[in-house]
């Protein structure tokens, strides 16, 4: 998967189209990413008391994962771009590059 944790992405489809956010977590086996502040849902959790007596639960708002095809990575110029790969000559490792301008991400 070409989108990694820590990337800044732009949502290009869905109810949050146009929103920017940072990737909190990536789930490559499901092809989904968790983006900060995007696709917020209300989750109903049961009331429970912890050891100090404070209760937790009720309706909690949190982010839900969205499909990786609905986001584009923002490059160093602040523009959305597709991702490509190239092999670094010095280290021999694969590095991600911006398809828009060819710079490393």
Swiss-Prot record:
GO biological process per UniProt: translation
Function of the protein: One of two assembly initiator proteins, it binds directly to the 5'-end of the 23S rRNA, where it nucleates assembly of the 50S subunit. One of the proteins that surrounds the polypeptide exit tunnel on the outside of the subunit.
Family, as annotated: Belongs to the universal ribosomal protein uL24 family.
Region (Disordered): 40-61
Family annotation (NCBIfam families): rplX_bact
Name of the protein described by the UniProt record: Large ribosomal subunit protein uL24
Quaternary context: Part of the 50S ribosomal subunit.
SUPFAM superfamilies given in the database record: Translation proteins SH3-like domain (SSF50104)
This protein's UniProt keywords: Ribonucleoprotein, Ribosomal protein, RNA-binding, rRNA-binding
UniProt organism field: Mycobacteroides abscessus (strain ATCC 19977 / DSM 44196 / CCUG 20993 / CIP 104536 / JCM 13569 / NCTC 13031 / TMC 1543 / L948) (Mycobacterium abscessus)
SMART domains: KOW
Record flagged with keyword Ribonucleoprotein: yes
One CC-aspect GO term: ribosome
Gene3D superfamilies linked: 2.30.30.30
């Amino acid at each position: 998967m070409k989108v990694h944790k820590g990337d800044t992405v732009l949502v290009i489809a869905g109810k949050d189209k146009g929103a920017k956010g940072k990737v909190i977590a990536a789930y490559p086996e499901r092809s989904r990413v968790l983006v900060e502040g995007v696709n917020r849902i209300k989750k109903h959790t049961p009331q429970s008391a912890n050891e100090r007596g404070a209760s937790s639960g009720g309706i909690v708002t949190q982010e839900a994962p969205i499909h990786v095809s609905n986001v584009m990575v923002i490059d160093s110029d602040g523009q959305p771009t597709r991702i490509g790969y190239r092999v670094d000559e010095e280290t021999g490792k694969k590095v991600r590059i911006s398809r828009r301008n060819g710079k490393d991400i």
